[in-house]
Swiss-Prot record:
<dbReference type="InterPro" id="IPR036402">
    <property type="entry name" value="EF-Ts_dimer_sf"/>
</dbReference>
<comment type="function">
    <text>Associates with the EF-Tu.GDP complex and induces the exchange of GDP to GTP. It remains bound to the aminoacyl-tRNA.EF-Tu.GTP complex up to the GTP hydrolysis stage on the ribosome.</text>
</comment>
<keyword id="KW-0963">Cytoplasm</keyword>
<dbReference type="Pfam" id="PF00889">
    <property type="entry name" value="EF_TS"/>
</dbReference>
<feature type="region of interest" description="Involved in Mg(2+) ion dislocation from EF-Tu">
    <location>
        <begin position="80"/>
        <end position="83"/>
    </location>
</feature>
<dbReference type="GO" id="GO:0003746">
    <property type="term" value="F:translation elongation factor activity"/>
</dbReference>
<dbReference type="InterPro" id="IPR001816">
    <property type="entry name" value="Transl_elong_EFTs/EF1B"/>
</dbReference>
<dbReference type="GO" id="GO:0005737">
    <property type="term" value="C:cytoplasm"/>
</dbReference>
<keyword id="KW-0648">Protein biosynthesis</keyword>
<comment type="similarity">
    <text>Belongs to the EF-Ts family.</text>
</comment>
<keyword id="KW-0251">Elongation factor</keyword>
<dbReference type="InterPro" id="IPR014039">
    <property type="entry name" value="Transl_elong_EFTs/EF1B_dimer"/>
</dbReference>
<dbReference type="InterPro" id="IPR009060">
    <property type="entry name" value="UBA-like_sf"/>
</dbReference>
<dbReference type="InterPro" id="IPR018101">
    <property type="entry name" value="Transl_elong_Ts_CS"/>
</dbReference>
<protein>
    <recommendedName>
        <fullName>Elongation factor Ts</fullName>
    </recommendedName>
</protein>
């Protein structure tokens, strides 16, 4: 029998999200060959999908698609980066975003209830893949935008953007979608920054100035200039254009005779609290449980 190291068990666990004892057993059966162990584990993934539903799905892929004057983006989650690259998972995501675009579905529940094209609903198709692969998955959100000048951009499968322009071109819309993906603006224009956000930032900047030794009156005057810079930094039109930093996005739009109506940016797992596990503590807990059995 091959000598299975703890490091090898840990690597297999990280790549498959399977339990420590399951990983050790799989490696023993594969004589220490981790790739063979992964293949065997995937083939034997017969666990019921219901057992996976409570696990946190914070990895995944953003899928985007344009159909005529409709642009759609979805976030499909899974538990591990390993599964986010699985061919079956990717094919399913592409089909789901196609369904959303062609049928103009903008609601997650409605999309889950839609026919996948195999006589089963989208939700049931996801459930079947959960049972086959052996980890939780979730269709988390969908965004649909209609308009004439739409741009979509997906960066590294993890960040997706839809932009909608008045005027301009689809190419400009795509360039701006790329910019939003890279620079994460929170608002379209500086004047769109909410009073609440401005007030909070002003308070922070005044405290910083006072703590540096400035009198309150001088600190407040200093902050006015900083606030203008702040609203520009957090708004799309106030930022230097990613493909030509010598001009702002506002200057680019003026040159192209266009305006930004809206943008939506998805990033995989944002807002989902990932569960962090102490590997050594988990090993100790599982050994203790095994000794009690």
């Amino acid at each position: 029998m091959a000598n299975i190291s703890a490091a090898l068990v840990k690597e297999l666990r990280e790549r498959t999200a399977a339990g420590m004892m399951d990983c050790k057993k799989a490696l023993e059966e594969a004589a220490g060959d981790i790739e063979l162990a992964i293949e065997n584990m995937r083939k034997s993934g017969q666990a019921k999908a219901a057992k996976k539903a409570g696990r946190i799905a914070a990895e995944g892929v953003i899928f985007a698609r344009t159909e005529g004057n409709v642009a759609v983006m979805i976030e499909l989650n899974c538990e591990t980066d390993f599964v986010s690259k699985d061919a079956g998972f990717l094919a399913m995501g592409q089909k789901i975003v196609e369904i959303a675009a062609t049928q103009k579905i903008a609601d997650v529940d409605a999309l889950k209830a839609a026919d996948f094209g195999n006589g089963e609903s989208v939700e049931l198709t996801i459930t079947n893949l959960i049972a086959k692969i052996g980890e939780n998955m979730n269709l988390r959100r969908v965004m649909l935008v209609e308009g004439d000048n739409l741009g979509t951009y997906v960066h590294g499968s993890r960040i997706g953007v839809i932009t909608k322009l008045a005027g301009g071109s689809d190419e400009l819309a795509k360039d701006l979608a790329m910019h939003v993906a890279a620079n994460s603006p929170q608002f379209v224009k500086p004047e769109d920054v909410s009073a609440e956000v401005v007030a909070k930032e002003r308070e922070i900047q005044i405290d910083i100035a006072i703590n540096s030794g400035k009198p309150k009156e001088i600190a407040e005057k200093m902050v006015e200039g900083r606030m203008k810079k702040f609203t520009g930094e957090v708004s799309l039109t106030g930022q230097p254009f990613v493909k030509d930093p010598s001009m702002t996005v506002a200057e680019l739009l003026k040159k192209e005779g266009a305006d930004v109506v809206s943008f939506t940016r998805f990033e995989v797992g944002e807002g989902i609290e990932k569960q962090e596990t102490d590997f050594a503590a988990e090993v100790a807990a599982q050994i203790a449980a095994a000794q009690k059995a």
